[in-house]
Amino acid sequence: MTATALEIAQALLRCPSVTPADAGALGVLEALLQDAGFATHRVTFSEPGTADIDNLYARIGDGAPHLCFAGHTDVVPPGEETAWSHGAFAGDVEGGLLYGRGAVDMKGGIACAVAATLDYLAANGGQPQQSGKGSISFLITGDEEDVAVNGTVKLLQWAAERGERFDHCIVGEPSNVEAIGDTIKIGRRGSQSGVLIVDGRQGHVAYPHRASNPIPDIATLITALNDEPLDQGSAQFQPSNLEFTSVDVGNPATNVIPAQARAKFNIRFNDHHTQETLRALVEQRLAAACGNRIRARIEWLPSNADVFVTKPGGFTDLVSAAIADITGRSPDLNTGGGTSDARFIAKYCPVVEFGLVGQTMHQIDERTPVSDLDKLTAIYRGVLERYFR
């Protein structure tokens, strides 16, 4: 009998893998997958100024079609552990609920994918298809919750250099809003941050004619950049949104006009834009608002968060059908929320995100119903059966 999702999830939760630590989590998965016949690879990536990160790639089968399950075993810190009703890394079950940091995001989802795969292989002669064709892989990182530079993005590059080719991918992020089966994430908005800088001239408040106050000017520019929408949205995406998050002058004095004002902002953008065209549009609007009077510029911050979407069709229909079989629900195909590692995978193959319900992720007493683990495992099993039919 293969391991259950609950057993695998508990083993993972008992590894305190607060990013960037692994704490044995990848070893739990590697042992299970090796026993099932997967070829496994542990790959460590480095980057100056960041922690070395261990990653896991495992594959069984040969050729196409190739379905990949992707995810991360690192978790955010638990916060004040005395505030938890159960140990953050105990993996306790009470009242039908599994408690622990990562239960939802996303050790529970990984556990369901592994359990479903092991059960499917056991029923199919140990191969994705009894004909011997087809491949299943797991692409698991320990670097998603922090800087995300030594994880999925580099593991994908490593796999491509080895000749790995993915046809489709499921990321087990907690996609559902209220109940298992209500939402599939088929894309994510891009993210671009920047700093608006307005230069003035420092001076004494009693002699404003000898100074140039940048504060009214930056207020004018903030209003101008906020007033006109960037777009009206698209078929799969809500309108792009520019949001200012802070305004700073670094001036503790009450009698000095500051020399400079800075405002930080972030833009979540849809598929009407690329990072390049978005920057050009904002710069154009800034120049128009400045005219010949205001001296301002934008410092754009580095970003690897491009917009992506997997168009509704064959693969999303397949996953939706597997969901409907188990839950009776027709999932919403959604592109809301923040960024995820799916943005890297989208450059290699169509990708969707479907996992547990995300209501308690990153919270004290993060938890998931054990029944949801069972449902998600059954859905993943249904995906495998349809995919390799």
From Swiss-Prot:
The keyword Lipid metabolism does not apply. It catalyses: N-succinyl-(2S,6S)-2,6-diaminopimelate + H2O = (2S,6S)-2,6-diaminopimelate + succinate. Pfam families: M20_dimer, Peptidase_M20. GO terms for molecular function: acetylornithine deacetylase activity; cobalt ion binding; succinyl-diaminopimelate desuccinylase activity; zinc ion binding. Keywords: Amino-acid biosynthesis, Cobalt, Diaminopimelate biosynthesis, Hydrolase, Lysine biosynthesis, Metal-binding, Zinc. Its EC number is 3.5.1.18. The active site is at D74, E144. It comes from the Bacteria. One of its GO terms (biological process) is diaminopimelate biosynthetic process. Catalyzes the hydrolysis of N-succinyl-L,L-diaminopimelic acid (SDAP), forming succinate and LL-2,6-diaminopimelate (DAP), an intermediate involved in the bacterial biosynthesis of lysine and meso-diaminopimelic acid, an essential component of bacterial cell walls. Belongs to the peptidase M20A family. DapE subfamily. Homodimer. This is Succinyl-diaminopimelate desuccinylase. The lineage of its organism: Bacteria, Pseudomonadati, Pseudomonadota, Alphaproteobacteria, Hyphomicrobiales.
